[in-house]
From Swiss-Prot:
It comes from Erythrobacter litoralis (strain HTCC2594). Its EC number is 2.7.2.8. GO terms for cellular component: cytoplasm. Its main location: cytoplasm. It catalyses: N-acetyl-L-glutamate + ATP = N-acetyl-L-glutamyl 5-phosphate + ADP. Catalyzes the ATP-dependent phosphorylation of N-acetyl-L-glutamate. This is Acetylglutamate kinase. GO terms for molecular function: acetylglutamate kinase activity; ATP binding. Keywords: Amino-acid biosynthesis, Arginine biosynthesis, ATP-binding, Cytoplasm, Kinase, Nucleotide-binding, Transferase. Pfam families: AA_kinase (PF00696). The gene is argB. Substrate binds at residues 68-69, 90, 195.
């Protein structure tokens, strides 16, 4: 067998390995959170769009929820507006909220729609305000004063969290053969517009859709143990123990909280994986070895 023939055979074997997954999940929904950091790399954005179009081509219905923190920060800097963060969340006054909506819904969303179109797919860009997709309420956070131990309410401005997801607009888009691309903006019953953490938004949508998978693409290879090894499978109970003993800390905590909420509210499973790895999502789902950390509900 020639080298060329061996290469072609290897490609065929990859497809055969993936066949059971294609069959099992045809017609199911994958919700994918794509971070704003990755969008700054055209090659990575192109590969991500190709992965999404491939999922659609094999009968899976992807729904993309994107972030945009770096792009919002860059625009605020250009406009001379200073950014303030509390616990990793941007304090969002009225002016900042308007800039965030402009960047998320008007720039990033349409850029991602364009990448998918270039890869041969048909995408429809929306925000959580369109079709009353996501109703939000003001996010309330508290902090404890280290000296007095008195809890204080943090006012984050127009930062929200989802209270209700109406999937009608997503169902309509999917039925029409489209790939929904969602900006993390929601409308409050109070008439205000709220900026929502993209992980949280993706988790709420995955739960409402009863998605087969929620993928959170991050800048780490998954959930790591104290020795730096990858934890490939976790349940909510195991996650709680790892948080208590300090194995899970920092920015990974809210991501896993999102995963736990999603799998306990209707999503079949969630995956935290390294979005910097080319085609990481396909490696996780369509190969036996997988990639990243899979979270399933407790039995």
């Amino acid at each position: 067998m020639t080298a060329t023939e061996k290469t072609e055979l290897a490609k065929a074997e990859v497809l055969i390995e993936a066949l059971p997954y294609f069959q099992r999940y045809a017609g199911r929904t994958f919700v994918v959170k794509y971070g704003g950091h990755a969008m700054g790399d055209p090659k990575a954005a192109r590969e991500f769009a190709e992965d999404i179009v491939l999922l659609k081509a094999v009968g899976i219905n992807p729904v993309v929820v994107h972030g945009g923190g770096p792009q919002i920060g860059a625009m605020l800097k250009r406009l001379g507006v200073e950014s303030t963060f509390v616990d990793g969340l941007r304090v969002t006054d009225k002016a900042t909220a308007e800039v965030a909506e402009m960047v998320l819904s008007g720039a990033i969303n349409k850029e991602l729609v364009g990448w998918i179109a270039q890869a041969g797919g048909k995408a429809m860009g929306v925000s959580g305000k369109d079709g009353s997709l996501v109703t939000a309420t003001k996010l309330e956070r508290t902090t404890r004063d280290p000296e007095s131990q008195i809890e204080q309410i943090l006012d984050l401005g127009f930062v929200g969290e989802p209270t209700h997801v109406d999937t009608t607009i997503l169902d309509t888009a999917v039925s029409a053969g489209m790939i929904p691309v969602v900006a993390p903006i929601g409308a409050g019953e109070d008439g205000h517009t709220y900026n929502i953490n993209a992980d949280t938004m993706a988790g709420a949508i995955a739960a409402a859709l009863g998605a087969a998978r929620l993928f959170l693409l991050t800048a780490v290879k998954g959930v790591l143990d104290k020795q730096g090894g990858l934890l490939t499978d976790l349940t909510p109970a195991q996650i709680a123990k790892l948080k208590d003993d300090g194995t899970i800390s920092g920015g990974m905590i809210p991501k896993l909280d999102t995963c736990v909420h999603a799998v306990e509210a209707g999503c079949e499973a969630a995956v935290v994986l390294d979005g910097r790895v080319p085609h990481a999502m396909l490696l996780e789902f369509f190969t036996a070895r997988g990639a990243g950390t899979l979270i399933r509900a407790d039995d």
